[in-house]
């Protein structure tokens, strides 16, 4: 097994994989080495990199909260309940902090991000949202 981070390790310019890197990983994949992408990114943006590889891999996304199989099915998902989300949103509102959460919308439809924008966004939120 070979586990790789995306940003600054496997992917350059956001989604691109260098041809030499792609060829080396394909060689390992063909030799039955499991290639795993491990990232803090959401699955949808990780898919762009997987598509550039040319073969399917395991993907550990959202800092380990979501694990996808090579066939894109979900192996593991750690989610907050609706009650927990409502409690977190109430706390964030009381503190004047905007709340942004990610969900696995792949094959489910809908948005990847759930945003409670009752509070103004800070610059760091804009940066994160634009990058992901």
Predicted regions and their residues:
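Active-site phosphate-binding/coordination module
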Residues: 19-127
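Anionic-ligand binding region
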Residues: 131-132
